[in-house]
Curated annotation (Swiss-Prot):
<dbReference type="InterPro" id="IPR000120">
    <property type="entry name" value="Amidase"/>
</dbReference>
<keyword id="KW-0436">Ligase</keyword>
<dbReference type="Pfam" id="PF01425">
    <property type="entry name" value="Amidase"/>
</dbReference>
<keyword id="KW-0547">Nucleotide-binding</keyword>
<comment type="subunit">
    <text>Heterotrimer of A, B and C subunits.</text>
</comment>
<dbReference type="GO" id="GO:0050567">
    <property type="term" value="F:glutaminyl-tRNA synthase (glutamine-hydrolyzing) activity"/>
</dbReference>
<dbReference type="InterPro" id="IPR023631">
    <property type="entry name" value="Amidase_dom"/>
</dbReference>
<feature type="active site" description="Charge relay system">
    <location>
        <position position="154"/>
    </location>
</feature>
<protein>
    <recommendedName>
        <fullName>Glutamyl-tRNA(Gln) amidotransferase subunit A</fullName>
        <ecNumber>6.3.5.7</ecNumber>
    </recommendedName>
</protein>
<keyword id="KW-0648">Protein biosynthesis</keyword>
<dbReference type="InterPro" id="IPR004412">
    <property type="entry name" value="GatA"/>
</dbReference>
<dbReference type="GO" id="GO:0005524">
    <property type="term" value="F:ATP binding"/>
</dbReference>
<keyword id="KW-0067">ATP-binding</keyword>
<comment type="function">
    <text>Allows the formation of correctly charged Gln-tRNA(Gln) through the transamidation of misacylated Glu-tRNA(Gln) in organisms which lack glutaminyl-tRNA synthetase. The reaction takes place in the presence of glutamine and ATP through an activated gamma-phospho-Glu-tRNA(Gln).</text>
</comment>
<dbReference type="InterPro" id="IPR020556">
    <property type="entry name" value="Amidase_CS"/>
</dbReference>
<dbReference type="GO" id="GO:0030956">
    <property type="term" value="C:glutamyl-tRNA(Gln) amidotransferase complex"/>
</dbReference>
<dbReference type="InterPro" id="IPR036928">
    <property type="entry name" value="AS_sf"/>
</dbReference>
Amino acid sequence: MSIRYESVENLLTLIKDKKIKPSDVVKDIYDAIEETDPTIKSFLALDKENAIKKAQELDELQAKDQMDGKLFGIPMGIKDNIITNGLETTCASKMLEGFVPIYESTVMEKLHKENAVLIGKLNMDEFAMGGSTETSYFKKTVNPFDHKAVPGGSSGGSAAAVAAGLVPLSLGSDTGGSIRQPAAYCGVVGMKPTYGRVSRFGLVAFASSLDQIGPLTRNVKDNAIVLEAISGADVNDSTSAPVDDVDFTSEIGKDIKGLKVALPKEYLGEGVADDVKEAVQNAVETLKSLGAVVEEVSLPNTKFGIPSYYVIASSEASSNLSRFDGIRYGYHSKEAHSLEELYKMSRSEGFGKEVKRRIFLGTFALSSGYYDAYYKKSQKVRTLIKNDFDKVFENYDVVVGPTAPTTAFNLGEEIDDPLTMYANDLLTTPVNLAGLPGISVPCGQSNGRPIGLQFIGKPFDEKTLYRVAYQYETQYNLHDVYEKL
C-alpha cells in the first residue's frame, strides 16, 4: 500500500519505528494531490512551503528520538471555515477571498502542538450552507467513488480528500449534518462530537448553537485518535464543556455483547430510499451477530427536525453574517457611491445565492410579528426533539439508522431545488438540535456509491459510539476500495 492510503495509526508506527520520515510522508501526499486533485477538486489552498519546512524539522526530531505529539508527522487537511494563521481562509466565498487570518483557531493550535502537518485548506459549501459543496464560489468538488456525483456537504472537500487518499485525516464542521452526510456519500468515517466537546474558537460562525468541529478519516480508530487531539475545554469558547474524559481509544476494541441499540422506525420511513433501507437492515443484523440487542423505538418528532433546523440555523446565520459589511474586512464593492450603497452592494455581490436565501429566511423569522410564529416555535420543537432522545437513552446505549436518506445525487441535480436539497438532512439535523454526538461509517454501496450508517450517542459518550462503530467496521469496511478509485 502506498503512503497516501496508509492509516493514521500505521503512519504513526512507521514514523516511530523510523521506517519512514515525516518529510517522505508529506512529499508523497503532495505528489498525490498533484496527480489526483485536478480531478477531485478538494483543495482550495495548499501550504506546501511551510509543510515541507515543518516536516524537515520533524525529521530532525525523529533522528533524535524526540517524537512528541499524538499526531507526529501526520498530514492533515482543514475545512476552509477553520481559521489558519497566515494561510488564506475564505469559507469558499467571494466575500472572504484573499482573507489571511492573523490568529490561530484553538483546534489548529492543538494539532500543531501534537506535531501534525498542515497540508492545505479544503473546499466546502459557501459559509457551510449547502449539502453538496456546489455553493462554493471557487470550484465544485466531485465524489471520488463516482465523478458524476456530489461529495455531499458542506464538508465535501474534507470527505473527498480523505476518500481519495489525499490526506489521512481532515477536519470538518457539522451544523446539521455537514460532516456525517459527506462522510456517508464518500464512504469514510465522520464524527460530529457532542456540542461543546471541541472548541469553536476560530471556526467562522454559521449557527452558533449548532456548529461543531469534528474529524473525518478512513477508519474508526484513526477518527478516535484525532478527536482525542482536538477535544477539551477552552477559555476562548464559553460554550466549550469542562469535560475531562477525552480517552476514546482505550476501550475501542471491547466487544458489544449486550449493548442496547435503538432503531427508530421513523429512520426507515418515508423518504428513505430502498437501497439505503436494505443496507441499514443488513447492518442491524450484523450488530445482532456481534451480540448487540437491537429494538425498534419511536422518535416521533423526527419529521419536524428539518423545518425547525432551517429556521434556527438561518436565524443565527443572519445575525452572525451581519459582520460582513464591506468595511472592516471581506469583499468591498467598488461601485458604491454612499455608505448605504456600500453595505448593500458589498453583501449582494459578495454572498452567493444560497447564503443570501438563508439570510433572508433568518431575517424574516426574527422580524417582529413573525418571531413567535417561527423562531420561538422552532426552539420549542427543538426541546421536543431533545426530549425524544432523552427518553430513548433512558433504556438504550446508542441509536442506529441511516446517515442520509439516499446515496450521493448527481452534480447539478438538486442545486436549483432547495427544498429537495434540504430534505437530505432529515436524519442528521435532529442530532445537532439535541446537541448529541453522531458518527457515520460506511455500510454498503449501491451502483458504486457508498451508503452511510449513523450511530447517535448520549451527550459526551463518544467512547461508546467509537466502540460500536469499530466493531461494526470489523465486519464491513471499504479499506480495500479506496486505492482502486
